[in-house]
């Protein structure tokens, strides 16, 4: 539940299933990328590029003129390419694969995975002020990197919703589950191979 200062009109073309997941994913991506000053000419690494936040993050970076390298499972690579990023697979040697894709270096990273992926970001990005984690908050202060501040607003959401209405952003819905199948939704999420958003609906 949010206050009226967090609300904006839903674009007519946006389905309610998308609207239910759009605000959190889009605002998190926008806030995170602006924290690391992602912009024109940058090479941006996004860990978890096929998830909801990563999906929006790739598209925003492309709109701003950045090149994106996106980490994802191999089954998600075609999807990540369709968003405008160059995908790479995790696993042994993935830091080397990123370096091959970005021979001039990586300027910034938004991490949606944590753990070894975050460790790799610290090795790949020279400036820790341009590394942000969405998940490993406990290590952020220790490592001297960024996390997303509480900066959601109606104004930010309205701007992002307008980009959706213009066709500049989209958020695919992988699956919907009724509330009484919330456990199934969680299992689907934990199974991986996510492309976009899983939404719980309430009749």
Features from the language model and the residues they span:
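Terminal helix/beta-alpha structural elements that buttress the NAD(P)+-binding lobe
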Residues: 1-203
């Amino acid at each position: 539940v949010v206050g009226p200062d967090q609300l904006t009109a839903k674009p007519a073309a946006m389905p309610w299933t998308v609207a239910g997941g759009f605000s959190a994913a889009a605002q998190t991506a926008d806030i995170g990328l602006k924290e690391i000053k992602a912009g024109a000419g940058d090479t941006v690494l996004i860990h978890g590029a096929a998830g909801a936040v990563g999906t929006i993050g790739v598209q925003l970076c492309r709109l701003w003129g950045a090149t994106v390298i996106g980490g994802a499972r191999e089954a998600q690579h075609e999807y990540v390419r369709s968003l405008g990023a160059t995908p790479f697979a995790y696993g042994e040697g993935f830091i080397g694969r990123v370096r091959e894709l970005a021979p001039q270096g990586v300027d910034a990273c938004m991490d949606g995975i944590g753990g070894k992926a975050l460790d790799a970001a610290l090795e790949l990005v020279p400036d820790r002020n341009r590394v942000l984690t969405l998940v490993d908050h406990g290590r952020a202060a220790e490592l001297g990197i960024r996390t997303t501040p509480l900066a959601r607003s109606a104004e930010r959401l309205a701007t992002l919703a307008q980009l959706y209405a213009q066709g500049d952003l989209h958020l695919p819905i992988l699956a919907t589950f009724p509330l009484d199948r919330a456990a199934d939704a969680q299992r689907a999420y934990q199974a991986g191979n996510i492309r976009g958003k899983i939404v719980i609906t309430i009749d």
